[in-house]
Amino acid sequence: MPREFSRSDRVSAQMQREIAEFLRTGIDAPELGMVTVSDVDVSRDLAVAKVFVTFLGARLETRAAVKRLGEFAPQLRQVLGRRMRMRIIPEIRFAYDDSLERGLHMDEVLRSLNKDGDL
């Protein structure tokens, strides 16, 4: 019977849980506000993990907040190395997840079209 999820999918899910826990308890960076890990995309060869995050109440501009978060990547890899059963922990790259903003923009466009009677 084939597996339902690939290894990279399982690693992504576990990394998402572990990274969220680390960001909640393992860093002291109040300027980032509340950081939410929305997704982790791990490459097929498990060499790179792209961590998508959102910020609530951040005092920094988005790019600066992502850069600041990247400063914690080496420490995070060490923590993941202790918590996960993997020979090699993927390189961690943070990226801002703008899907919520894009969704809100699409909603505004649809509402304006509907209001104008174009829909």
From Swiss-Prot:
Predominant location: cytoplasm
Top-level taxon: Bacteria
Listed InterPro entries: KH_dom-like_a/b, RbfA, RbfA_dom_sf, Ribosome-bd_factorA_CS
Gene Ontology biological process terms from the UniProt entry: maturation of SSU-rRNA
Coiled-coil ranges per UniProt: none
Pfam families: RBFA
The protein's name: Ribosome-binding factor A
Organism listed in the record: Methylococcus capsulatus (strain ATCC 33009 / NCIMB 11132 / Bath)
Gene name as annotated: rbfA
